[in-house]
Amino acid sequence: MSDSRAAAPAETRHSRIAALAKIGTCRTPSFSPDGAFAAFVSDLSGTPQVWQVSAVGGWPDQVTAFDDPVIAVRWSPKGDWLAVSVAPGGGLNQAIFVVRPDGSGLRRLTEEGPVTNELGPWSRDGRFLAITSNRRDPASLDCYTVEVGKWDWRPLTASPGDAAVYDFLPDAARAVVHRSPHRGDADLFLVERQTMRETLLTPHAGPANIRNARVSGQGDRVFFPSNLDREFCALCAIRLDPAGMPGPVEFVRDHPGADLDDLDVSRDGQRAALLWNAEGKSELEIVDLPSGDLVVRPELPAEIAMDPTFSPDGRSLALTCTGAAAPVDIWSLEIETAAWRSLTRSPHAGVALGDLVRPELVRFPAADNLPLSAWLYLPRDFERPGPTVLSFHGGPEGQERPYFSYLYQALVEAGIAVLAPNVRGSAGFGKTFVHLDDGPLRVGAVRDILSCVGYATGTSIADPRRIGIMGGSYGGYMTMAGLTEFPSDFAAGADYFGIVNFETFFAHCEPWMAAISKVEYGDPETQRDLLRGLSPIHKIDRVTAATLVLHGANDTNVPVVEAEQIVASLRARNVPVEYVLFPDEGHGFVKERNRIQAAQATVDWFSKYLNSKTPGALQ
């Protein structure tokens, strides 16, 4: 590491970190019915709100001004309402509102209180809005429809599991519902709106991942990504007869070795936009559905694309795009010419995007020779071996991909390398790989931490005396697992809202989340010994590394009791620990001032404890 960077005044370093953390995001486009405008969510004002912009680009207008962050927005097919979900205090108990496109007429549709609500789609005639909620049973997420004007709630489903409406049939008499009994398995159902009668669309044996489904323009086919009877998600379809009875699942299109992440189907049902995940990077295909032929495979503006959304006339496609050196922005593709237009331009004052570091995809074996991979971010004048931080993603069934990360860029600017791995249990590498950490197999994922250390030191990237570890949510669990299982390998750690005690996690998290997490982690009623053995809190006496703990007070995904346990235990043992609690955040830090504080605290922590060649030594 460059000594000049290591010794840079905190004030100078903090101003650079603030500039990186202030880089805005614009995401989740939703077109007006005439295609003239797009609504989207952006933190241009400091907290995510609803904005709208001309479909040809230009200066956006802010629509909402909530104190709390907006999660999603959907424009009604009639054009008269925007449906908006808001996270009070940043937590999971979202509130659903409707508001006029000009910002007037704000109306709350959900009740106050600790109820989980999620925004679903509009029916095609704009009469009904779908909402997922656990208002009936805290341990289950049910689907409801709300009729515009009456604003009354009508149940669509009332069964155990995590359910969500993916789409309505054209006449709004039936809806396609996704239901997951537990993580890693799901089904699609066709549900009659009036009677709640369900027809299973996807009978199968064994686990299957089913993602965002879309109904064809005529209502006779349902398209969706799935790994039913295969390793990777492909484009699947089910034909519906006039009575709604389904035919067998058909495989329409695949991409060997890649997962179909998301899709959209044009309003006339003629074309599909397919987003593939190929080794962590996105690839876009526009496909003619009647023939199955490829229309265009354009180069994307950045490494990652999300939220594919056709314009009402089907001539253009809006996407959220981002990359290691590209902020999160919305782009529009003119399909016939394959020309891209930027609809938004997230500000990046004080940051030259061309100076940001792009990662390299590296591969290495686990102890049992299972292939692992990671994204490696190296400072431009990095002196090997040097200070290195391992960063673990959340999930567990998440995936490290080359998204824009202000924290990674801040660390490499401070002269610290970042190795961000995908260990067993990560998504994007096939069905078998993602289930290799289920229940008692989790010990294998924890052992993979040591394989990551071995790669970093064996390639002379990391100084073995100056290695840190960090991660958020499940990545926070992996952080604390690394610090307890391999204490001599780490000089410092940063635990972002991570699980440290599976017993208290199950006791205090959202009941519906606890219900679907038993297969992934273990059943607290029948596998208590397993959960205790996997919980870092029961090995806390092994920790010697300086530990930074960051959490949101309103987190009901991983409740703050997890942070409180680890902080109290480390303080009692005189292990260096710092606790940063955000009173206005939930599971993740979205407000600008909090992003800045968290990033500054993290970079300061690793700069302090990894700059010395003696593990854990104070500067």
Residue ranges and their predicted role:
Residues V423-Q619:
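Active-site-proximal cap/loop segments of hydrolase catalytic domains
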Residues K22-V41, D67-S85, I96, E112-T132, ...:
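Conserved beta-propeller blade repeats
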